[in-house]
UniProtKB/Swiss-Prot annotation:
Its EC number is 1.15.1.2. It holds the Pfam family Desulfoferrodox. Fe cation binds at E14, H16, H41, H47, C111, H114. It catalyses: reduced [rubredoxin] + superoxide + 2 H(+) = oxidized [rubredoxin] + H2O2. This is Superoxide reductase. The gene is sorA. InterPro entries: Desulfoferrodoxin_Fe-bd_dom (IPR002742), Desulfoferrodoxin_Fe-bd_dom_sf (IPR036073), Desulfoferrodoxin_SOR (IPR051233).
Length: 124
């Protein structure tokens, strides 16, 4: 099962774990997901975060909603070779969803070397 390959940990000590922060303004929920907040993750052609996905599981429901996915596609590569462009996308994603419900926010991040990482927070 794929769930057996997804890793987690404390984001303060593990650079791959996505950090989820949110603000609720009525029905609008503004979410920031970041990899490497406490310990920077490498961002090179050879080692980088490819994407972040955000899911929402409303309280009392059995299935998640995919809120969104952000891909990071610039990692220093150019026609001159790896790490030659000085253009890098940082693994930070912003999402806005509209809901009155409480529940869980789940974030997944994908490192091209170390695989899938997850984190969750309770949405009040």
């Amino acid at each position: 099962m794929i769930s057996e390959t997804i890793r987690s940990g404390d984001w303060k000590g593990e650079k791959h774990v996505p950090v989820i922060e949110y603000e609720r303004e009525g029905e609008l929920v503004k979410v920031k997901v970041q990899v490497g907040k406490e310990i920077p993750h490498p961002n090179t052609t050879e080692h980088h975060i490819r994407y972040i996905e955000l899911y929402f599981l409303p309280e009392g429901e059995n299935f998640v909603y995919q809120v969104g996915r952000v891909e990071f596609t610039a990692h220093g590569e150019s026609v001159n070779g790896p790490n030659t462009s000085d253009v890098y996308t940082e693994p930070i994603a912003y999402f806005v969803l509209k809901t009155k419900k409480k529940g869980k926010l789940y974030a997944l991040s994908y490192c091209n070397i170390h695989g899938l990482w997850e984190n969750e927070v309770t949405l009040e």
